[in-house]
Amino acid sequence: MFTFNQYSVSFFTNIRKLTFLALLASFAAFLPGCDNQRIAQLEEGVSTEGDVRIKFGEPEKIWDGANGAKIFEYNRQPAGTQNYMITIGTDGKMSALRQVLTPQNFAKIAPGMMMEDVRKMLGKPMKITPYELVNEYHYQWRFMDGANESDKKIFTVVFNTDLKVKSTGSAMDPALSPNGPN
């Protein structure tokens, strides 16, 4: 007769966690291919808001854009490396589709910028970590800084307690470390 003890329960818990992580990783790897296909089927100035919603689903958030436009946020964090902002003009047509997690956009983040402005620019972060002892909040986004898997990085924006940017930086994705993430 087989009995469970703390070691067998721990073993089965670890197996479940590993299975879940493997499924999550395979799903995340599949998303960029799906996005590329969806993007190819949409055309700026022609595709409608309805076309965008059919291809991408409901947006994570809808931001107010210039001149009455709406900006749909499509988040691919935490496992993905892209966030998309799709602009719908007042005529109901898609006027822009942009992958926003780029070094060019990161360079626009400046000290004193408000958190909401950063969110409008980059989309929802993969992780928010409060550091209460130093009165900081670290917002992090995973992104690709090249074409290879080894080019995955983490972009961090450090905010003060007023949610104004203090500093920014990029580092290698800890998930790529031989020792795994922290």
Q: What kind of feature is each model-predicted range?
A:
Residues M1-P32:
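Sec-dependent bacterial lipoprotein signal peptides
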Residues C34-N182:
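Residues within mature, well-folded domains
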